[in-house]
Each structure stands twice: as structure tokens, then as C-alpha cells.
Amino acid sequence: MNPEELLDALDPDQRAVATQVAGPLAVLAGAGTGKTRAITYRIAYGAAVGAVDPSNVLAVTFTQRAAFEMRHRLAQLGVPKAQARTFHSAALRQLRHFWPTVVGGPLPDVIPHKASLVAASAARLGIAIDRTNVRDIAAEVEWAKVSMIDAAHYAASVARLRRDVPAGLDAGDMARLLDVYEDAKNERGVIDFEDILIYLCGMLQERADVASIVRKQYRSFVVDEFQDVNLLQARLLDLWLGGRHDVCVVGDVAQTIYSFTGASPDYLTGFGRKHPGARVVELTRDYRSTPQIVTLANDVLARATQREGTVRLSSQRDGGAHVGYCTYDDDHAEAAGVAAQIADLVAGGVQPHNIAVLMRTNGQSQAFEEALGHRGIPVAVAGGKPFFARDDVRTAISRLRAAAAAAQEGALGELVRDVLSGVGWAPDAPSGQAGSERWSNMNAIVGWADDSHADTLAAFVAELDERIAYQVEPDKAGVELATIHAAKGLEWDAVFLVGLSEGLLPISYAKTPEAREEERRLLYVAVTRARDLLTLSWARSRGADGRGKRKRSRLLDGIWPQERGVGAPKKKVRASTRALNHAFEEEASPQAIDLFARLKAWRLAVSRQAGVPPFAVFTDQTLRDIAVAMPKNTTQLRVIRGIGDVKVQRFAAPVLALVRGEEVVVDEEA
């Protein structure tokens, strides 16, 4: 793409990010404002105008999935050479390269978990701990190491920070355990994940030759989710830069929810002090959520006592349904009520995987899983065998690899379908339970093929290999039950935020003002996961007999409307789609209303021709967004949520014709 085409796909603020091709630059990006789009286009634009060599760019993300997504987007924009990795992935790659020269021999194995070493260390000290305590102590070891606090300074540090020592230990015991843990690790000849960063920092600091090679390779840096950076990661970034300032950081102070792991927003808010002359760009246009949801998010944030570096969102969506507020008698009633509302949504055409139930702790999920199961609604359960480790998936990829080696020719989607038809895929899902999981696994691969830009089967297999390397699995098929922490970075059409009572949100152990502010930010993160529908709920007691009386969360004081009684507003939920369309008709222009009606008529004809429900062509929300945006070309059409490459290929011509006011005829008998 040429530079002008790249900029045409961005809003003014995103364009300001993209055209600032040299750092230092701080991007304060609110939820749903397109930060990933802005920074990937910045790299692509810099390459297009010759300001940067993509092979000298390192984009740092916080999850493997985010790194995969960024690499995929950059490849689509014609920039396949830019590196996108997590801190640990980038550091491990460099450490493996330099270790034989600097230290000698191969890099020690990296232990995937600390549990066995922590348990052995505690036993050596005569400290009795159970499985839960092992997990908590392992987390404390990680916190100390990323905070660069050694055993000698641990007790003073936790006292200064008013940090609770886990597992009922005193600070002295925990300090001794830190020492013994390091000894046990060294005796086994292994390293942990924190050591990857620690050892690389040591190399870069002590070996000028190593630092010179790394800095020559990477001259421009982009760091996403910068509000979640800890001291060790900030130190590594400084050493990568080596006094240079060509760095772009992106983050949202309001989404700082990992301070208990050592993360701090201070690196984002203090970026200008560290890099004098740094430019700051705010992304405030929210393309994800309706105005009603964005208003609630802004209200939550407005009550925070720490707002430095936060932004106020402005929804770019048309009016939607009102946020729902439900009060229930007890936990069982809450789970049943939420399940009833979800059943209504599913009956109305919303796919289960587009719905989430978010909660503060994992322990809250069982009641909702049972209530949804009672109604026959599939649930996405955490855990289970990894997708790429499943036998049928491994067989499918082996078949595809063999077909690619044989250089079979044809349209990619047809080739993949043909190969996978021999291992359980068919155009229609099996009616019974038998074979349904295998079919779902195969269909996920077919879906990837449909969305792929690969020209050949070999190129598609290479994409699958990259997914395997990054462990990027398909989206789960059922209603997502997730903690708010796990939901960060994700979004759904409909979100139910449950258990909003004192002791849960804010959590009972959030005793300091700083900890309670982090609970408020958790609420903000949860609210901003919703695109179209959001319902908040809490229960007055734990059990039906009234035991375990509760109070509604203080975080909702001044926000929760006057009590609406007990139970789920089922009628209101059933009317949610009508409410969205009614709000659109009240607020949109006459031209947009007319275009929306013509788009719906066209969609109905297309769905009948294809034998699929209308929402499988485009959702009402996507049609509303088209009607308001009135895109003039495929580039502008592609920006609209819900329109990927496959739908652009299939429907761009008739949709753009309808936008131009032309008549489009669909032969429903074809």
C-alpha cells in the first residue's frame, strides 16, 4: 500500500500516530480506540516513506496472541520483516544466540512452572505449605524478581510498600525462601522466566560487544500495553535503547490491573520526563462500544482518585440499548437470571461465542456454568488439551502439509476443504454429539483458510506453523466464563458483569487506597469489553436462606440507578435488538435510515439464496455502521467492524452499489 492509502484508513488521531515515524512518542489509547491499528500502520507508513527499515523494528507485546496478531496485520500491510514479540520471546531469542559465546555451552532449560522448586525450597526450610500456598509463593518470587528485589532487601521493601506476605509467612521466612529457591534452581541447572530478562540485562550491561550487535539490529521500538511494564522490563528496554529515543509506547493508565505482579503505570505517565521532547497523542474515539456503554465507562473512571494519563472516551457508534442493572435475592437466582437472558439472546440469533459472563474470581464461575448447561447453552470452559496437541488437529495439519508438498493447485479454501474432508470435515455440522468436536476443530482450520491472505497451500501451512509457534488457538465455541483479568484485551457483543458486591469487587483483600483504585480500574476494564449489550448484576445474599448477606459494590455508588426490583428484565432483553434499531431510527439521518432499510432487504435476499440466517451475512450493527459511514471504497468498508477480507471479497460490490443509491437485484432461486 502507498502512504496515502495507509493514512486514508485512519482517523485523525490514529493518523497523528502513524505520521510520527520517529520517537519518542507516547500514545494514550483508551479502550476500543484502535491502538493496534494505529501502531501497525505507523510501522507500515514509516516503511512506505523510507523512514524506517522494517527489519530494524522490534514491536513488543505482552501476549503471544497479540504478537501474532501484530505480525499478521503487518504482513497484510506489506511489512513482513518487522519483528513482533513478547518481552520474554525477544529476550529468549537474543539470550540463546549470545549464551554460547558469552557463557559457554547451551542455554539452560527454562522451567515452565515454579511449583516443584518452591515446594522443595519450603521443605528444605521446614515450612509446611499446601498447593494454594505454593502458587501464591511462586507469584511472590516472580514479583520480587521483576521488581529487582533480592532476599537481603525483601523485608524492608514489603514493609515500605505495605505489601502482604503470602501464605501466612513473615517477611524473614519469605526472604530465606527466596535465597533457597535460587540455590535449588542453580543446583538443578535450570532458569526461570524472570532469569531470561535478568541474564540478558546483565549481558547487555557488561558486554559492550553484545549490546552493540543488538542495538545495530534493533533501532526502532514499539511497546504495547506500556501501563503493564514492570521494573525489570523497563530496565531491559532502556538497555535495548542504549540512550537512544526512537521508541513509541502505547498504553491506557485506566487499564492498569496488574500492579500486584509488579506492573506500574508510572513508566507511561513519566515517559516525557525520561524522554524530553516526547510527543503525546491521545486516542479517544471508541469504535467498539455503544454510547450508553461508553458513558458508563467514563462515569466509572470519573470517580477515580488517580486519573493522571487517563483519557475520556467518545463513542463513534450510533445509539444502542440501555445498560441493564439487575439485583437478585441470592447467587443461584443471579446465575439463573443471567442464563435466562443469555438464552433469549441466543434465541434471537446472537452466537454463544459472542457472549461473555465476567466475574472477579474463578470461584464464581461454577453456578453460571451449571445454569447455562441446564438450558443447553454451550460454555467455553478453560483448560483441556491445547488445540494443536489434539490428535485430529495434528493429523489434519499433517495432511495439509503433505498436500502442500505435492504442490496441489486450486483456490485455497477449496483445497483445504478437500483435504480436511478426509479427516472429519463436512459442509454441515453433525447433528449428534458424536464427531461434533472433531468437526469443530476441522471447521476452525477451514475458517482460518477463508480469512487467509495466503496465495498457496504451502503459504497457508506456513501460517499454521506460525500459529503453532505462538499457540494462537481458535476462538472458543461457547459462552465465555472468564475473570476480568483474563478478559483484558478481549471483547464480545454482549457482556454480563456479575457478582458486583462488596468483598468481590472490590475484593476483600484490597485494603489500601491504591488497591481499591485498582479494583475500580478492573470495573472499567470489564465495562469496556462489551460492544452492544451490557448488564450488571449482584446478589443480596450467598444462599436462598438469606445467609451471607451482602452489600452492592461501593464502586457503583452514584452510578447504579434506583432499585428496579428483583429478577431479570426478560422483556427488555428480548427487545434489545428492536431497541437498538429504534435508537438508530431516532438519531440517524434520513439518508442513513433509508440505506439501512435497503441493506436489510438486500441481506434478507442474500441469506435466503445462501440458506443461512440473515445475521450470518451481516449483523444489524454492521449494517447500521455501514449506513452511517457510507463508505466510498473497499478500504473504507474494511475499516467497519464485522467486515473482514472474506466479506469484502463476497459483498463489497453490492454493498458499495447500495451506498451509491444503485439498485441491487439478488436472484433468490440461484
Enumerate the predicted regions with their spans.
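Conserved RecA-like ASCE P-loop NTPase motor core of nucleic-acid helicases/translocases
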Residues: 52-63, 82, 224, 250, ...
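Accessory DNA-binding and partner-docking regions appended to nucleic-acid-acting proteins
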Residues: 537-670
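Conserved RecA-like helicase ATPase core segment
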Residues: 2, 6, 45, 231-328
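ATP-hydrolysis module of ASCE/P-loop NTPase motor domains
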Residues: 101-194, 218, 280-282, 286, ...
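P-loop NTPase Walker
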Residues: 1-104, 108-109, 212, 295-298, ...
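Conserved helicase C-terminal RecA-like lobe
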Residues: 163, 167, 351, 365-377, ...
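Inter-lobe coupling/hinge region of RecA-like P-loop helicase motors
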Residues: 3-10, 15-19, 23-31, 55, ...
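Conserved helicase NTPase motor core
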Residues: 8-19, 23-31, 38, 58-59, ...
